[in-house]
């Protein structure tokens, strides 16, 4: 009987903890996209100079948005 109660207690605490840490999928995707954009900017030697303008650098086909170089593929 003790094992049965312990199993129920663990199940209840697992179910109660499911909603305690919400994950925002948009924030996770933005973080992954920012890391990929930073790696691509370093490969193409791109520099963000002015918001809304093309980034500067050799073979750099990116636009400066949010203080970083964003490529068309994003």
Swiss-Prot record:
Top-level taxon of the source organism: Eukaryota
Function: Acts as a neurotoxin by inhibiting an ion channel.
Chain segments annotated as transmembrane: none
Swiss-Prot/TrEMBL domain comment: The cysteine framework is IX (C-C-C-C-C-C).
GO molecular function, one term: toxin activity
Record key words, sorted: Disulfide bond, Ion channel impairing toxin, Neurotoxin, Secreted, Signal, Toxin
Tissue note: Expressed by the venom duct.
Similarity comment: family membership: Belongs to the conopeptide P-like superfamily.
A single Gene Ontology CC term: extracellular region
Propeptide: 26-42
Subcellular location: Secreted
Stretch forming the signal peptide: 1-25
Species this chain originates from: Iotyrris olangoensis (Sea snail)
Chief location bin: secreted
Protein name: Turripeptide OL08
PTM summary: Contains 3 disulfide bonds.
